[in-house]
């Protein structure tokens, strides 16, 4: 991975009631950002550790990525994701860097379908802290109001 020349990436996080989201909480804007953050952060952490994946890690990453569709609440998104992942040659995904690159490639295929911007690998490296080896500069935290369950 190459060093970053993007002067750190900044972001903005806002809270929106799920009823205000396009297609509600189960549409792409409801579940997508958190799911992508989880996927990319895990892959970034493995890339930062460096080296080759163990056979167990390879199997676990393949299984997790292949089966993530079960967590996607949007039916058309789920089908599209399954189509993307079914076409992946996991045999060549043998390092953390390659896992990270794969997650960026998958995300960009989804972005293309949704007419969203393509994110370069270099920008993703900056966003998820592979350039500094410190991980993402920001995190997403969610705390549910559980008093409604009492």
Swiss-Prot record:
It holds the Pfam family Evr1_Alr. Disulfide bonds join 74-77. Its EC number is 1.8.3.2. It comes from the Viruses. It is an enzyme of class 1 (oxidoreductase). PROSITE patterns: ERV_ALR (PS51324). Gene3D superfamilies: ERV/ALR sulfhydryl oxidase domain. Its cofactor is FAD. It catalyses: 2 R'C(R)SH + O2 = R'C(R)S-S(R)CR' + H2O2. The keyword Ion transport does not apply. Residues 24-128 form the ERV/ALR sulfhydryl oxidase domain. The keyword Oxidoreductase applies. GO terms for molecular function: thiol oxidase activity. Keywords: Disulfide bond, FAD, Flavoprotein, Oxidoreductase. FAD-dependent sulfhydryl oxidase that catalyzes disulfide bond formation. This is Putative FAD-linked sulfhydryl oxidase 088R. It comes from Frog virus 3 (isolate Goorha) (FV-3). The lineage of its organism: Viruses, Varidnaviria, Bamfordvirae, Nucleocytoviricota, Megaviricetes.
